Amino acid sequence: MTMISTDGKSLLLALQIHFSGVFKAHLTFPKDYPLRPPKMKFITEIWHPNVDKNGDVCISILHEPGEDKYGYEKPEERWLPIHTVETIMISVISMLADPNGDSPANVDAAKEWREDRNGEFKRKVARCVRKSQETAFE
């Protein structure tokens, strides 16, 4: 993983995952960090159940602290001021390897992951990996 601060408020992350793909993401910190969580957005196309089609990452650790109005997450699973960039990255890398199909941000990717993991889902992931390799050094 490579991290570069681009403006003092956000990090550009290059994650080497998914069969040597290089996926870039921004981690943007609010003014009241660490009381509120940063936002993470992939800028490299990625096909994953917990990353929406705009690249926004949907993971409990990056959700606002407190009760989940939908009842899917426990308060202790959500953002706490003790979390660090390291704990965020560990959680995101774990999520990328083991998607949460119960709370998808990309419903189409979640459906393929459940029903055709080794077929269409794997083909789309492989396409994203190839594309990420082609643009890794841009």
Question: Residues of each region from the PLM?
Answer:
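Proline-anchored loop/turn motifs at beta-strand termini and strand-loop-strand connectors
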Residues: T28-P37, V92
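Domain-scale recognition of soluble eukaryotic interaction modules
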Residues: L11, L15, K39-E138
